[in-house]
Amino acid sequence: VPLRRAGTRLLAATVTAMAAGIVAGLLARLLMRAVTVLAGGEPGFSLAGTLAILLVFAGAMLPGAVATAFGRRRSGLVLLGLGAAVLMLESVAIGLQENPGQLFGSGGTTTVLVVLVMLAFPPVILGEALAVWRMTSALAARRTVPAPRDDARARR
């Protein structure tokens, strides 16, 4: 892969991983806040915490995005899947760090709401992985410089 094309593909991978990571990270941050509220905790947004979540969500998708941008579609899918699995594991672990006894011991409505909030994490994360794969594939397929036309071939 020529250096210019490699740079373009790397940029496409980085931009798509960052864009999808920001959107999915913000949605996950809101879901984490909902879990905190349901646990009876004091919800708070720290800028450092939010930026860390956005960075983790973007960083988890970057290896898969780079592999996809360089035409390694299967490797890209595997890496995106692994990144999504890590994010799901961490999302559940962080959600359950809030007082689990309070979350599931309250019974009734609170338990149902907690389960619904926890079930919202996988679609957000899988949506992020799918968006990264599709956007990276589309951007990497675009040419940066049009190929020179051979007039003799064009006339045939």
Which positions does each model-derived feature cover?
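Juxtamembrane/disordered regions of integral membrane proteins
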Residues: 1-156
